[in-house]
């Protein structure tokens, strides 16, 4: 079962994301702070992370860099109100696999989440195949 970790401090949006992205083959884990996300990551690695930038206990961009150092294979999508070109470029250059600005379309979000999950699965399959050759 694929797990998606959502790190979003807006409780209503966090709950809405969980509802919108849940399927029979997905488990959604929601956190509202970086600390809660770190604690959750001790329990296991998700298949994908949705990460807000403006969090109450720190910068999502700083956490993004930490995550990419520790868990480079996990796709991370930034989901944020920071919508200038400079913000988007900075997020992508720091390692985000995608960048979605608020407000957003649920259908676009679902498509981007599905794309990142497919890419990660394909990469994992290629890596496994390479190891066993």
Predicted regions located by residue number:
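Short, Lys/Arg-enriched segments at the junction into DNA-binding effector domains
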Residues: 3, 115-133
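Two-component/phosphorelay signaling modules centered on CheY-like receiver
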Residues: 10-29
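Acidic, metal-coordinating helix/loop segments flanking the phosphotransfer/catalytic sites
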Residues: 30-48
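Acidic catalytic/metal-coordinating carboxylates
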Residues: 33, 59-62
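Active-site residues of response regulator receiver
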Residues: 52, 80
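The feature encodes the CheY-like receiver
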Residues: 56, 84, 102
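Short amphipathic alpha-helix used as the core "switch/output" element in two-component signaling
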Residues: 61-72
């Amino acid at each position: 079962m694929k797990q998606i970790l959502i790190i979003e401090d807006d409780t209503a949006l966090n709950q809405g994301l969980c509802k919108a992205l849940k399927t029979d083959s997905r488990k959604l884990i929601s956190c509202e702070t970086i600390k809660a996300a770190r604690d959750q990551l001790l329990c296991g690695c998700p298949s994908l992370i949705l990460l807000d930038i403006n969090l109450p206990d720190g910068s999502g961009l700083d956490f993004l860099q930490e995550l990419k150092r520790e868990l480079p294979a996990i796709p991370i999508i930034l989901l944020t109100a920071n919508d200038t070109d400079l913000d988007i470029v900075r997020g992508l250059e720091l390692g985000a696999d995608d960048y979605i600005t608020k407000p957003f379309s649920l259908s676009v979000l679902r498509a981007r989440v599905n794309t990142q999950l497919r890419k990660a699965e394909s990469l994992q399959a290629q890596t496994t195949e390479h190891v066993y050759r």
